[in-house]
Design a protein with these regions (language model features):
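Short, contiguous alpha-helical
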Residues: 34-48, 54-92, 131-172
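Acidic/histidine-rich alpha-helical segments that form the ligand environment
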Residues: 44, 98-131, 137-152
Length: 172
C-alpha cells in the first residue's frame, strides 16, 4: 500500500510539473522562432556579402535572380511583421535594392523588425486571425508559413552561390 501511495504521489507530481511546462511552452515558441529569424538573418546577410556583384545572376529565364530572392525576403519580412503587429500594409511594392551594402543593411533591418514583432507576441496573440496573401490564418500560422518559405529560399540562395563557385560563409 505504501508503495502504491508513493507511486501515486510521484505521478501527481509529474503531472503537475508537465502542466506547468505545457503552460510555459508558448513563450518558448516566440523565443525559438525569434532565434530562427536571427539565424536566417545572419545567413542571408552573409550570402548577400559573398554574392555582391552577382545580384543579377539567375540560373535561367523565368526564375528569380540572386537579388530578386534577397528583395523578396525583405518584402516578406515586412509583410509578416505588419501582420504580427496589426500594422496595415500599404500594398505599395518597394523599389528593388541593387546596391550590395544597402541590400545587407535592408536585410539586417527587416530581420531586426521581424524579430521584435515575433518576440513581442503574447500567447493569445498567436491565435489571433490575420489575412496574409488573401488567406485567413492565425498569426502562428502566418509565422510558420513565411519562415518555412524563407528556409526554402535559403536553400535556393545557397544553390545559386555554389553554382557561381561561391562557398557560403558559414561553410568555410
Amino acid at each position: 500500500m505504501k508503495k502504491i501511495l508513493t507511486q501515486y504521489g510521484a505521478y501527481v507530481l509529474a503531472i503537475a510539473l508537465m502542466v506547468s511546462l505545457v503552460q510555459a511552452q508558448p513563450a518558448k515558441f516566440q523565443a525559438a522562432f525569434g532565434e530562427d529569424a536571427g539565424t536566417l538573418s545572419k545567413k542571408f546577410i552573409g550570402l548577400a556579402q559573398v554574392m555582391a556583384g552577382k545580384f543579377e545572376w539567375k540560373p535561367g529565364q523565368g526564375v528569380r535572380s540572386v537579388g530578386d530572392v534577397f528583395n523578396l525576403i525583405i518584402e516578406e519580412n515586412g509583410l509578416l511583421a505588419d501582420a504580427l503587429t496589426g500594422k496595415t500594409n500599404t500594398g505599395a511594392e518597394p523599389a528593388a535594392i541593387t546596391d550590395p551594402g544597402k541590400m545587407q543593411d535592408a536585410l539586417k533591418a527587416s530581420y531586426a523588425n521581424l524579430q521584435k514583432a515575433i518576440t513581442g507576441l503574447s500567447d493569445n496573440d498567436l491565435q489571433t486571425h490575420v489575412k496574409l496573401f488573401g488567406e485567413d490564418m492565425t498569426k502562428q500560422g502566418a509565422l510558420l508559413l513565411i519562415l518555412e518559405d524563407q528556409h526554402e529560399h535559403l536553400g535556393q540562395s545557397i544553390a545559386y552561390a555554389r553554382s557561381n563557385g561561391v562557398v557560403p560563409p558559414w561553410s568555410k
